[in-house]
């Protein structure tokens, strides 16, 4: 059977090789093709923008926003709307033409920079020749797409920071230059390995920028107990990562009799001081993104997707799914509003008022809010616990959750940890163990949740601070084990960021990425001692003796 598409950007790709007929995520071949075309023209735009800067000419910030938006829209489980994707291709072609007109030197521009299309049929035809498999060398292809997937994650973080008024020209310039370099056939494998690590370095900058944006706007996360039950009022469930969307929704629902609940990666919003004043901000409903087909059903009210992860909705609740920002799905209502613009949530609020209250699926509380500022405020307590031997090791279990049955490994691993270990987590991987009763060590909970996937930055800050406090030369001398779960491209930039900080001995699961060729995987093993996972029992024995 010939390939109708090829995509291998997520952990769940078929056979850990690639989706060739339809995406496990639900992406159809036409959608995959339009995403391929969009990435291709975005790389071309990056080439033109990079050359303009080299000529000393300014590149307008709206171009930066177009690039980050394009990259973000192609992240797994973000946008399934072919019309939106085709329109983004058109916008990018127009931007290329506009910028190219200002170039003094137009020689040697790539096809990606010069190709134009307005009809969807032309985009689909082009996609067949410019996707992943267009690069024939296994190792060059592997590195080009490792970099591209890392840039997608970086773009997501840059966009969230931009929404809150923070952006760095150097970050945008790097993203565009790196995209252009993935078109450059003169670059060797060694050049691309160096670019991969440079991508990680800028990934740290992107996460630091977003951390500053979030904490500067909403305060530093603090230890918080979050309700996981429900109230008697109708509600709106907000999923994704965009805190500005949440802020606007909370303001507009105040006094309406409609409660607001977080879902999946929105859970950490409860940790920010600025959101605690809203009495109708009730709690968190459900678990990680992949359980949404059951949980959106039982929530009963409308659901707002602000970013990934959206699973193609069932007909039974599709009319209750609203998208905004870069998210799109054909047939779902989209709430417009670009960066800096007001979003009108009156339609979803009116819809909520016609719905019954959420069906309770669990009750009780979970605790979180252990980002770097909060943990460093407890530094003396933590340091004393380490020095006394009460805490023997920390285990970083940040990252993503997913559908695979093999991910029960992380629950079993957490349950089997020695009682003198503390889990440091961020991202939706936490749902595999954040409701277990793992207790505490001298009042320090054994699961310290820093927040969303981007808050893996907090875990790096904590590690570097501990290195300083204990007077160590190398961050790898700390009593920290890294056992990270990945799913999509934001996890890729987190991994590259950790590597750029010199962190070694990271275990990545439940499988290593399909886009790592054997030789590229070998380089990562040799330089950073990256490994996979086996069984909970064997890994516990290997990590803790």
From Swiss-Prot:
- Using the UniProt record, name the top-level EC class of this enzyme in a single word: oxidoreductase
User: One GO biological process from the UniProt record?
Assistant: response to hydrogen peroxide
Reactions catalysed according to its record: A + NH4(+) + H2O = hydroxylamine + AH2 + H(+)
Q: Which HAMAP family match?
A: Hydroxylam_reduct (MF_00069)
Q: Does the keyword Zinc apply?
A: no
Q: How is the cofactor bound?
A: Binds 1 spin-admixed [4Fe-4S] cluster. Binds 1 hybrid [4Fe-2O-2S] cluster.
Superkingdom of the source? Answer: Bacteria
Q: Which residues bind [4Fe-4S] cluster?
A: 7, 10, 19, 25
The modified positions for Cysteine persulfide read 400
Q: What is this protein called?
A: Hydroxylamine reductase
Please give the subunit comment from the record: Monomer.
Cofactors named for this entry? [4Fe-4S] cluster; hybrid [4Fe-2O-2S] cluster
Indicate the family of this protein: Belongs to the HCP family.
Q: Which gene encodes it?
A: hcp
The EC number(s) this enzyme carries: 1.7.99.1
